[in-house]
Amino acid sequence: MKRAYDCAAPQACNAHSLINKRLNDEEMRAIMEKNKQSELTGRYQAAADSLVDKLKKDTNVIAVILCGSLSYDQVWEKSDIDMALVVRDQVLKNDSFCIVEDDITVNINSIVTRSGFKRYLESLSGGSMLHSLYARGKIIYSTDESLYEYFEEFKIMGSDDRALTVLLSASELYYYYEKCQKWLQVKENPLYAQYYLLKAAEVIARIEVCARGEIPDREALVKAYEENPGLMSAYYSDAMSHQYSPPEIRHAAEEMERYMERHLDIIKKPILEYMSDHEMKTVTMISKFFKTESHFIIGILEYLAEKGIIAKVSQTIKITPKSRLAIEEIAFQYIN
């Protein structure tokens, strides 16, 4: 008569062998994927190097800046290559091109002259997507050594840029907050109200990354969720995993407002600095100063007025210089 463990031993050995085989298969797949990725990266890098070698022969090209995934992240088979060029001073007919190198698309996103290079970078709003695109980039060729130092300085996000980015992001966040409330309370459509919570996730992530002194980029949402899942889950992971009930949406919207209140100091900073002369500023004046649209910034201005930080007033204006009819435009004033 066979003992129980005599029968069990071969089964245990077979199971152990099967587990080892699966582990070996997984390890082999991982190695193959790693090799495939290495080959792909090498191909993209070779394409970039090949194009740079060609550009070096053009005496008009002063510098080449590599941007996008190849400069700091991981490329995949459908990636393209992003570059920017600095050229000698001249009148340019085109400021961008889409070219091909080794059957890979290369986007020359901008072509700027040497004298206009600094002005171009300074024109980019601190924390904007273009700012982040170039901030994650690197100069891979230059005949002007001074460009290296200036480009690295450009990547630093100062306190003023940080505050401006938070202000403009808060403007967008307040818009989503109001839309969420409208579709929940007035339209009685909680599903569409939840859509605005999802849109708010990216804006909150931008503020979170910016508040840490980093330049927000395309991966801001991933970073913010990793750093603060407790905050982001209501607008990101939880909001994507199931349909919220009206009370859940209401709670998330209320948390959104409390989030803005916690960041009031940095949100109001650019506005109060601009209004420090205590003169009335129309919404048109404010939007021009911050290089945005009136309809985009009015919401956060009214929010600051509701909080008693600035006063909402009006100023008589004319639609055109030749208009006789005077109308009232919304304005704001800082009364300390």
Which residues make up each language-model segment?
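Helical scaffold of the NTase/Pol beta-like nucleotidyltransferase catalytic core
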Residues: 13, 22-62, 299, 335-336
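Short hydrophobic alpha-helical segments enriched in small aliphatic residues
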Residues: 6-8, 15-17, 25-26
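Conserved NTP/Mg2+-binding pocket subregion across the NTase superfamily
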Residues: 29-40, 46, 101-188
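Intrinsically disordered, low-complexity segments enriched in serine/proline and basic residues
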Residues: 2-4, 10-12, 316
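Catalytic metal-binding acidic patch
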Residues: 65-114
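Conserved nucleotidyltransferase catalytic core and NTase-mimicking acidic/glycine-rich helix/loop elements
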Residues: 161-336
